[in-house]
């Protein structure tokens, strides 16, 4: 990022220090706001002591649970479920795939994900309803493919089958309420950004629930999180701050090189090529946020359709994370549970091409229905 800004300055283009310092402020605000939800969504004592269910139903409960739970509170959902599914201190292949794939599939549609906020930074005016309608079928496909890969039909699904997490509907009450509030507000006031709405509602809803459940003790817990626990997400926040610096550098570099662009327009074919490049970069070890920042900044002069661009970038994240060995999710799984990061690449080798093909089809379908 610094090198790009220097290249721009040497070519007579002033460095965009404002973009470098504040480019991802709204995204960082969202990550901090969503972190408060952990105070009201952690499993209760009954769930922690409940026997683990088995079989095909347990598999789907776990898949849907990590997907819907993770759609709101992000990566802590994976660790909450994984810690409970440990067997003799180890997390099996099937459980690891269910948790990581089910979580990553949220990125196709969830407005609470950093991926969506990062994409919306480069696509103001995107229509959330269309993005969600495009992403939900892809998320459903991802869950179905995962179930096929992990549900061994030759086993007795009531006995030796998948050992899952005892997920209950009450666990999803707060995330579901937040989804309803955000979507309802966006429908009433579409000019208000999704990131702003989530950043406002997440801590407010958390505070209301804490006061209702615990009274003054809940207020102390809320204040304690604000004063002492927000720093727990510092590595992720630094990553997005660095991405803002990178965006400023790319802007300066483009100005220095005469603004050379990869395409002359941004339609479904260009969107598909962008998606393939993001996933290829992730496979080589580039974090999706860097790829999204690069392409979002690079394509901005084309004034691409914001909805198509946001769908493309979120798909790139949803597929790029399971494709890449160095994603934060896979590195965390290795550090906490001893699963080699390259094992995920091997396990997902057939899964990724199927999702890519479906996503490219979805991009073309969205563009065709909207006359792009």
Identify what each model region corresponds to.
Residues 80-93, 117-129, 267-323, 335-337:
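Membrane-interfacial helix-loop connectors
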Residues 3-6, 26-37, 86-88, 138-148, ...:
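Alpha-helical transmembrane segments and their membrane-interface exit regions
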Residues 1-20, 24-25, 147-249:
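Hydrophobic transmembrane alpha-helices of multi-pass small-molecule transporters
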Residues 10-86, 219-302:
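Membrane-embedded alpha-helical segments and adjacent helix-loop junctions characteristic
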Residues 18-32, 63-67, 129-142, 189-205, ...:
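Alpha-helical transmembrane segments
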Residues 361-372:
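Juxtamembrane boundary at the C-terminal end of a transmembrane helix
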Residues 64-73, 101-109, 282-283, 316-322:
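Helix-loop-helix module between adjacent transmembrane segments
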Residues 89-173, 331-362:
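Membrane-core helix-loop-helix motifs of multi-pass transport proteins
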């Amino acid at each position: 990022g610094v090198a790009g800004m220097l290249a721009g300055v040497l070519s007579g283009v002033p460095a965009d220090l404002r973009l470098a310092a504040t480019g991802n402020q709204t995204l960082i605000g969202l990550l901090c706001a969503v972190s408060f939800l952990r105070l009201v969504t952690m499993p209760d004592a009954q769930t922690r002591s409940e026997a683990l269910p088995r079989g095909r139903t347990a598999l789907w409960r776990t898949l849907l649970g990590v997907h819907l739970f993770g759609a709101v509170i992000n990566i802590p959902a994976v660790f909450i479920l994984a810690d409970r599914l440990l067997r003799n201190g180890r997390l099996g292949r099937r459980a690891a795939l269910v948790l990581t794939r089910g979580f990553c599939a949220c990125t196709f549609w969830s407005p609470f994900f950093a991926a969506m906020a990062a994409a919306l930074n480069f696509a103001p005016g995107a229509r959330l309803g269309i993005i969600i309608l495009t992403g939900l079928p892809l998320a459903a496909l991802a869950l179905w493919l995962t179930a096929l890969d992990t549900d061994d039909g030759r086993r007795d699904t009531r006995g030796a089958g998948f050992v899952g997490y005892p997920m209950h509907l009450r666990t999803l009450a707060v995330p579901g309420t937040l989804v309803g509030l955000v979507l309802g507000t966006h429908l009433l006031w579409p000019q208000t950004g999704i990131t702003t709405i989530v950043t406002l509602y997440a801590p407010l809803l958390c505070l209301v629930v804490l006061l209702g459940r615990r009274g003054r003790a809940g207020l102390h817990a809320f204040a304690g999180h604000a004063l002492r626990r927000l720093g727990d997400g510092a590595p992720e926040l630094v990553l997005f701050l660095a991405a803002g610096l990178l965006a400023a550098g790319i802007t300066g570099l483009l100005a220095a090189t005469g603004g050379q662009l990869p395409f002359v327009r941004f339609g479904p074919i260009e969107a598909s090529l962008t998606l393939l490049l993001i996933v290829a970069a992730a496979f080589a070890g580039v974090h999706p946020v860097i790829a999204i920042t690069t392409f979002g900044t690079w394509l901005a002069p084309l004034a691409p359709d914001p909805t198509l661009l946001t769908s493309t970038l979120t798909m790139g994240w949803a597929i790029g994370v399971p494709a890449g060995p160095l994603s934060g999710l896979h590195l965390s799984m290795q550090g906490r549970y001893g699963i080699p990061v390259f094992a995920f690449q091997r396990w997902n080798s057939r899964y990724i091409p199927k999702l890519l093909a479906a996503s490219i089809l979805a991009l073309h379908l969205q563009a065709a229905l909207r006359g792009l």
